[in-house]
A protein has these predicted regions:
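N-terminal mature ectodomain segment of secretory-pathway/periplasmic proteins
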Residues: 38-46, 50-129
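N-terminal propeptides/low-complexity segments immediately following signal peptides
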Residues: 24-36
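Bacterial N-terminal signal peptides
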Residues: 8-17
Length: 252
């Protein structure tokens, strides 16, 4: 695989981490909460405002339990599709997050074996020239902060049976969310980073300790030479574990 295409693929794979919520210290403002994703009461009507939709999505994810996840570990398989190819490249992945810290490992030999670590201050990549999108500023991590000062929730067009809303922070980092009009679950989202658009579609979910976690999802990354696709299947989920001290250690 050509180097530029490989780097694009790796950058795309890093966005798989955006389905994992990464928590920064923050306090929520007054609003409905829930004790478990399965017990959440979701009310979405034709008159629901963008803020109502964001609150419904937050509640469906598990409410305050979703917000207060200390760390999350996902492991599973991934099938990669290069632009203009119907042949998949099978591999495995592991994602660990805690706050704004991240460790992601991808093994899709012989095409790519990759490790990315961010320890909260500095980052490490096993491949040069790969930039990590800040996971606390996009995706489900942004949904956690929908009601925080400095975050703006606005309307976007709905699509099919899904209601849409946009969350942006003070720096302009933006994610567009589309939620099920009945359950409030986030079914897809789009992020905009470094001039590119990354799309994620949720297929299946698991409820773990009152938190809704995607167990199967796909991603799409548009490039001038075509689109990358990746299908992820999560086989193991762990929340709020005691992590080893070197979980996010930067290699010497």
């Amino acid at each position: 695989m050509k180097q530029n295409l490989l780097l694009s693929l790796v950058a795309f794979l890093l966005c798989g981490a955006l389905i994992v919520q990464a928590q920064e210290p923050a306090k929520s403002v007054a609003g409905p909460t829930t004790t478990a994703a399965g017990a959440a009461v979701i009310s979405i009507t034709a008159n629901s405002t963008p803020l109502d939709l964001a609150r419904a999505a937050f509640t469906a994810q598990g409410g305050e339990k979703f917000r207060n996840v200390r760390n999350m570990m996902l492991r599973g398989s991934v099938d990669l599709y290069q632009p203009n190819s119907v042949q998949s490249i099978p591999g495995g992945f592991s994602i660990v997050t805690a706050g704004d810290k991240l460790r992601m490992d991808i093994d899709a030999r012989p095409i790519v074996v990759f490790k990315q670590i961010y320890d909260g201050q500095q980052s490490y990549s096993s491949l040069p020239n790969v930039e990590l999108p800040p996971i606390t500023k996009f995706g489900l991590s942004l949904l956690i902060k929908f009601d925080q000062p400095g975050y703006k929730v606005t309307a976007i067009p709905d699509k099919k049976r899904q209601r849409g809303f946009r969350i942006a922070d003070a720096e302009g980092n933006t994610t567009d969310f589309y939620i099920d009009a009945t359950t409030g679950r986030v079914m897809s989202f789009l992020i905009y980073y470094a001039g590119y658009t990354f799309g994620t579609d949720m297929k299946k979910f698991k409820e773990i300790d009152g938190v809704l976690v995607p167990s199967s999802f796909s991603q799409r990354f548009e490039m001038p030479q075509g689109a990358f696709f990746a299908d992820y299947n999560v086989k193991e989920v762990k929340l709020n574990q005691t992590l080893p001290e070197d979980a996010f250690a930067i290699p010497n």
